[in-house]
A protein has these predicted regions:
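Active-site beta->alpha loop and helix N-cap motifs at the rims of alpha/beta catalytic domains
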Residues: 2-5, 11-132, 139, 144-149
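Catalytic alpha/beta core domains of metabolic enzymes, predominantly
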Residues: 103, 113, 118-252
Length: 252
C-alpha cells in the first residue's frame, strides 16, 4: 500500500486535492436528480451519505440506489457512507447491522470506496478491510469525527496511523475547532502524516466557519480530498464546489 490510491480514473494523493460532493437525499427520485445536478459542478468523486436515505437498511433498496447512482455517475468514483449518530450522522444502528450493510455493499462492487468508522472497533475495521481487499476493486476510507473539539496533535496522528495499521487504504479525520490554534493543530498533524507516515493518503478537515481554511490548503498540508457542496452540506463549513476549485487552483 502506498501514499497514492487509484480509484477508476482518479488518483488520490497526487496533484491537487480532489473535490468530493456528498449526496444527502432521502429518496431515489431526489437522489438521482441531485446526482444529475452535481455533474455540472467541479466534482472528482461523489459520497452517498446513505444514512440520510429512508430505507438504506433494506438490502434490495440500498442496492437499487447504488445501481442507479453507478449508472448516473459514469466513471466518477462513488464513496458509500453510513455516518452514525455517534459521529454526527443520521444513523442509529447497531455495530452488527452497520458491519453487515457495509459488507454487502463491498461484495456488490457498486461502490468504489466504503467509509468505515474507526469507533466501530478494530475487529470490524479489519474484517471490512479484508473483504474490500479481496474484492480487488473496493477501497476502504477509515474515518473518525469529533464534533465537539480538536484533540491534541499527537492523538490525531495516532488515530490516523492506527487506521493505516488496520488495513485502510485512506485515513480520514474531521475535528471541530474552538479556537484558531485548534485549526493549526489539525493542519500540523496532517503535515506530520504527510512527512513521516505516508503509507496511505490522508483526508483531514477542521469543520465549521473557523476551520474553512483547512478545506482549501490540502496542497500544503497533504490532505488528499476536500468536501464541497452542490446543494445541501453534509457537515458544517463545507464550501460550494466551484468556490473550492477556484481556491485550490490559485493556492497550488
Amino acid at each position: 500500500m502506498g501514499s497514492i490510491v487509484q480509484v477508476r480514473n482518479l488518483t488520490l494523493g497526487e496533484g491537487l486535492p480532489k473535490i468530493c460532493i456528498p449526496l444527502t437525499d432521502t429518496d431515489l427520485h431526489s437522489l438521482l436528480r441531485s446526482a444529475q445536478t452535481l455533474l455540472k459542478s467541479p466534482c472528482d468523486l461523489v459520497e452517498w451519505r446513505a444514512d440520510f436515505y429512508a430505507d438504506f437498511r433494506i438490502k434490495d433498496t440500498c442496492l437499487e440506489a447504488l445501481h442507479a447512482l453507478r449508472q448516473a455517475l459514469g466513471e466518477i468514483p462513488l464513496l458509500f457512507t453510513i455516518r452514525t449518530s455517534e459521529e454526527g450522522g443520521q444513523a442509529v444502528i447497531s455495530p452488527d447491522e452497520y458491519e453487515a450493510i457495509n459488507h454487502f455493499v463491498i461484495e456488490s462492487g457498486l461502490a468504489d470506496l466504503v467509509d468505515v468508522e474507526l469507533s466501530k472497533g478494530d475487529e470490524v475495521m479489519t474484517r471490512l478491510c479484508t473483504a474490500a481487499h479481496h474484492s480487488d476493486t473496493v477501497k476502504i476510507v477509515a474515518s473518525k469525527h469529533d464534533f465537539s473539539k480538536t484533540p491534541p496533535e499527537s492523538e490525531i496522528v495516532e488515530s490516523l496511523c492506527k487506521m493505516q495499521e488496520l488495513g485502510a487504504d485512506i485515513a480520514k479525520y474531521a475535528v471541530m475547532p474552538n479556537s484558531e490554534p485548534d485549526v493549526l493543530t489539525l493542519l500540523s498533524a496532517t503535515i506530520i502524516m504527510k512527512e513521516h507516515h505516508c503509507k496511505t493518503p490522508v483526508i483531514t478537515m477542521s469543520m465549521g466557519k473557523l476551520g474553512a481554511i483547512s478545506r482549501v490548503c490540502g496542497s500544503l498540508s497533504g490532505s488528499a480530498v476536500t468536501f464541497g457542496t452542490a446543494g445541501h452540506a453534509s457537515a458544517p463549513g463545507q464550501l460550494p464546489a466551484d468556490i473550492l476549485k477556484t481556491f485550490l487552483e490559485h493556492l497550488q
